[in-house]
Amino acid sequence: MRTDSADASKAAAVRQTLSAGPASSGAARVPAIGTQRTCASMAGVKAASKEISRTLMKLLKSRQGVPVETLFGVLGSLAGFSCQMGIRDEYSRRANALPPLHVVRTLDGRVFYFGDALNEMLAESQYSVWSLSASHARKLGGTPPDLSAIFAHVSRTCGGTDFGVPRFPEGRPVKDLPVDYVRTFWSLIQPAVQKHCNGPSEWHIAYGLAIQAAMDVSKAVIDPGAALEIVMECAVPMSKLDPREVGL
């Protein structure tokens, strides 16, 4: 895939940013995503997923190609973060409604977010990030990782120095942290997602479909199960991240 000069400049800026690192309740649940979706709705989600894939391929491509570990790290980070941001956006449209997110404050002053609505989009519904990604990994012959162990690790490290530091498959290192990926790529990718999707409850689905597409094109160079492990090691902690930590 070739890029024009503007894309090349933007891609170079993104790589430089990642290498440098970062700069200095009881409300009702979000309605479950139904098993039936309209053709028009899915068309928008699919268009959004294609934009995610196209843009990331351009931004991440170097002379050596697209590093697949980084690709899945970015996709997982954005997918997880989109679950929380989708809930926030949905409830911002409702008068006097607080998002159903449970706030956890640590001794060092950091804030993290948990809750059933978050888990539903991330791992429990038919169209959750996990459901879409794991089912496709199995279809391609991969073995999904132990998701409960990933959740347990994130909960155990919440507030500590190991929070948001993924444990990647052996031989599959990813250079940057998930929070760096969110900080760098969210503002570049999310506008297209919002443009095509029918609402915030579909954002995470678009990222899930983009993860499926990435598995399809990379299955010859990375086992789909390993790709899925990278995705979820990034997605779970980023779903709980305080948006203020990335300037939102």
Predicted regions and their residues:
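Solvent-exposed interaction surfaces and binding hotspots enriched for charged
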Residues: 2-248
